[in-house]
């Protein structure tokens, strides 16, 4: 029987059928978007929010794959697709046919296989490639398990390498930037002729990451040769060390595909076995693939777009797909998980979240998930509280459930305030509120790449002095915003004294604004300004770097909670708007010996490719000139996003770049968190519906096109609506209809009156 032809025919039928059903959201997803340039997207097989991201690894890339790299070195079970931190790529499998006798042959990360993108196919939950060895490799996944199907040429020796040494070569530890992904200990056991199990414990972007696996094979293993440190260890069935690999050879019917099902766990090998038993019960690869595809289609169907022929429809659903990879599950079916103290606990929730890239995701990705999947956000709130109980502070940036101190700020605060104001309950809100206050007042959080993290100097000086800490301006601005979010939580819970205190801290951003230059700039501990000053300057993590991954041009507008207060510093609306206009027209040149590589997607000095400015296009609403933002938002949507491998202008960053697109294309964006408010931008689809637990939001944009990007008028549930912002409860408290009339010229009257503007911190009180 020619198994290869049968499997290939089934795969071809799937490929054709999947993309023929163009009305289904999952059929619109183009997962190769962002796999080139700086997108750091990996074409993984994964379930929504799944722990397993099973996919190909190419040479020396941050996330594991780059479209331009010609070699595949294997298929690992863990990735962080979208970058924003370099790690994972654990438990790699690689099919081979020739006899393996040498160190060179047993190390696929030194050999690899060429491939062609013409032989590559991916859809939600499935990846397929024909390697130049003529082996067809197919991958699918459930939440906690991966499934492989390898079809070898007729008559070939069917072998598989398992590599526990392989990891992310660009992963540095949090302690020293010269140390790469290091295996602390790994183990592999040949249990019987159908089973292999083991684990890999490593230091990388986060310390002491535990990955356990339990693998079962459809074909009998007739030999399992173990390898450690340049030598085969013949005659042994288990091996422990830091350079462990195995070469498996299969018996059974010649030419028959080898199907592998693999459970993954952060807890134990038995946890991996239980995950496998719960999620994959047979050997039907196509059934698992179909089920995961169905799960993705159901998840993506939360948003339905009526525009049948819109080219942006594929970008939208791909972006929503990327956004719904996170927060990443990190608990077993038993509820057990490994926390930041490396101990195992059991939680009362379905999902313990193991990847929290909060510096990125607090802006739009987490608020988007709170709208579409409040159940996931509820478990995320429980995750935050569990993390606090085990390590004494709320997460800053976690990977594999472990804190790594990456980036700045304490951005659990916006997540909590956003979830609570949206009515998401089912967790101990008062305990979480106490955790917010404790976390925001720690003198020392820890260190990242030898750089200090903490609020000691911030509290002492009411700004972070540039002679005492790097990225001092960015830290100050983000601490102020996070403190504002704490104040919102205090207001909602009725804590007046706390509200007054944190509102006061939220105004400390004013201490770094130079009114002579109209820029935020670094200030020394003696109160003097850092000199010389260059608003185009970036010197990534060097001693004179006052701005995290950006310039003063980009960071001066990071006061999302107090637009009016910021305008007052500029001297009023007109100079503020003039400066904001200039942001998009000045030179895109970046000065400095080591400019931050993340400053990408530039329009003037506006950088769409990095997160600090994602709200900036909406700051025109504070000034009563929303039409200026409408045009620029439309330009970004149409020029900086497409479905090509280069279609994301920066790292997707745990889905934040994608979530910005999703929210913005709906016509509104969460500039602030904790007030339940969205700033109106510009919609791009004629009609879409958003399904949420309380009903359906219908969004219509009559006459919309790229040219017709200007709002002429708005109605909410049939009534005229002139405000340039919206309340969450009006959109998502039940069924609602938001309708736009669009045109080619701006209506400068709509959304421009003082009563139509969003509230700023300087005008808010405890009561309102």
Question: How would you label these PLM feature ranges?
Answer:
Residues 1-8:
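Bacterial N-terminal signal peptides that target proteins for export
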Residues 8-17:
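Bacterial N-terminal signal peptides
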Residues 21-366, 370-414, 420-477, 485-511, ...:
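Accessory carbohydrate-recognition regions in carbohydrate-active enzymes
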Residues 482:
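ATP-dependent phospho-/nucleotidyl transfer catalytic cores
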Residues 690-692:
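Extracellular/periplasmic, surface-exposed regions of secreted and cell-surface proteins
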Residues 710:
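Extracellular attachment/recognition segments
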């Amino acid at each position: 029987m020619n198994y290869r032809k049968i499997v290939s025919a089934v795969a071809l039928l799937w490929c054709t059928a999947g993309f023929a059903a163009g009305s289904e959201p999952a059929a619109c997803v183009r997962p190769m978007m962002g796999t080139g340039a700086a997108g750091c997207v990996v074409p993984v097989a994964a379930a929504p929010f799944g722990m397993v991201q099973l996919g190909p690894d190419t040479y020396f890339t941050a996330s594991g794959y780059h479209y331009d790299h010609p070699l595949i070195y294997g298929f690992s079970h863990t990735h962080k697709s979208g970058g924003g931190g370099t790690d994972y790529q654990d438990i790699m499998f690689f099919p081979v046919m020739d006899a393996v006798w040498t160190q060179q042959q047993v190390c696929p990360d030194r050999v690899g296989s060429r491939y062609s993108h013409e032989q590559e196919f991916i859809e939600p939950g499935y990846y397929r490639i024909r390697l130049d060895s003529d082996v067809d490799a197919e991958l699918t996944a459930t939440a906690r398990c991966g499934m492989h199907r390898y079809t070898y040429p007729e008559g070939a020796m069917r072998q598989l390498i398992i590599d526990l040494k392989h990891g992310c070569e660009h992963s540095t530890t949090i302690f020293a930037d010269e140390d790469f992904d290091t295996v602390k200990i790994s183990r592999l056991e040949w249990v019987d002729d159908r089973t292999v199990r083991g684990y890999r414990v490593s230091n990388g972007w986060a310390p002491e990451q535990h990955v356990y696996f339990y693998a079962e094979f459809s074909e009998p293993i007739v030999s399992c040769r173990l390898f450690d440190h340049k030598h085969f260890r013949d005659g042994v069935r288990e091996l422990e060390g830091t350079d462990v690999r195995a070469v498996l050879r299969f018996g059974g019917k010649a030419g028959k595909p080898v199907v592998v099902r693999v459970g993954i766990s952060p807890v134990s090998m038995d946890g991996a076995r239980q995950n496998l038993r719960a999620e994959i019960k047979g050997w039907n690869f196509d059934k698992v693939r179909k089920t995961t595809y169905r799960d993705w289609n159901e998840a993506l169907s939360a948003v339905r777009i009526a525009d049948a022929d819109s080219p942006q429809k594929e970008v939208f659903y791909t972006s929503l797909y990327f956004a719904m990879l996170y927060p990443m599950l990190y608990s077993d079916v038993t509820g057990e998980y490994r926390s930041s103290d490396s101990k195992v606990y059991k939680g009362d929730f379905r999902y313990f979240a193991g990847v929290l890239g909060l510096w990125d995701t607090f802006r739009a990705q987490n608020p988007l998930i709170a709208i579409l999947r409040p159940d996931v956000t509820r478990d995320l709130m429980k995750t935050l509280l569990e993390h606090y109980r085990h390590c004494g502070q709320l997460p800053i940036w976690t990977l594999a459930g472990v804190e790594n101190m990456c980036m700045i700020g304490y951005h659990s605060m916006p997540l909590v305030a956003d979830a609570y104001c949206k009515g998401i309950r089912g967790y101990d809100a008062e305990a979480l509120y106490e955790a917010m206050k404790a976390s925001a007042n720690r003198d020392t959080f820890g260190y990242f790449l030898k750089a200090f993290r903490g609020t000691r100097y911030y509290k002492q000086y009411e700004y972070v002095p540039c002679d005492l800490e790097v990225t001092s301006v960015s830290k100050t601005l983000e601490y102020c915003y996070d403190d504002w979010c704490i104040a919102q939580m205090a207001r909602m819970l009725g804590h007046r004294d706390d509200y007054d205190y944190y509102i006061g801290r939220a105004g400390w951003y004013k201490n770094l604004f130079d009114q002579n230059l109209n820029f935020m700039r670094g200030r020394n501990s003696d109160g003097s300004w850092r000199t010389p000053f260059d608003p185009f300057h970036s010197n990534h993590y060097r001693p004179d770097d006052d701005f995290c991954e950006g310039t003063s041009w980009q960071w001066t507008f990071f006061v999302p909670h107090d637009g009016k207060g910021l305008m007052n510093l500029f001297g009023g609306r007109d100079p503020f708007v003039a400066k904001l206009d200039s942001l998009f027209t000045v030179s895109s040149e970046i000065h400095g010996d080591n400019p931050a590589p993340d400053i990408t997607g530039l329009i003037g000095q506006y950088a769409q490719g990095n997160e600090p400015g994602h709200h900036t296009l909406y700051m025109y609403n504070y000034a009563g000139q929303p039409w200026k933002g409408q045009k620029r938002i439309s330009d970004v949507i149409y020029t900086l996003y497409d479905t090509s491998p280069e279609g994301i202008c920066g790292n997707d960053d745990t889905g934040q770049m994608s979530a910005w697109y999703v929210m913005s294309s709906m016509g509104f964006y969460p500039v602030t968190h904790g007030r339940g408010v969205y700033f109106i931008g510009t919609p791009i689809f004629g009609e879409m519906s958003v399904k949420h637990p309380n009903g359906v939001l219908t969004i219509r944009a009559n006459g919309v096109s790229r040219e017709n990007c200007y709002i002429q008028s708005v109605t909410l549930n049939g009534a005229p609506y002139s405000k340039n912002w919206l309340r969450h409860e009006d959109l998502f408290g039940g069924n609602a209809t938001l309708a736009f009339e669009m045109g080619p010229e701006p209506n400068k009257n709509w959304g421009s009156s003082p009563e139509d503007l969003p509230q700023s911190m300087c005008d808010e009180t405890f009561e309102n």
